[in-house]
Amino acid sequence: MRLKIVRASGEETLHEITPSIEYAFELYAKKGFYRAFSEDMKMSDVYWLAWECLRKDGVTVPTFGATFIDTLAKVEVVGEDDNPNS
């Protein structure tokens, strides 16, 4: 599973959801990663994953919340076979 993140500036990046990001998500959300995305998917969870991916990649981001979300134009969950440029 990967995230395609499009920032408000137009910058697009693609991020792998690594085991450490899954673990951080489960601590944050208090629910299992795969269950959250198969049965109870919320966009706020996707935005949190985008925040964590950017943060883990060394990008300086605001504290998670509305200020961070305002820096996003679009976030998509993409599979391994999906074309990230579509």
Short names for language-model regions:
Residues 1-14, 19-86:
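Charged interaction scaffolds used for protein-protein
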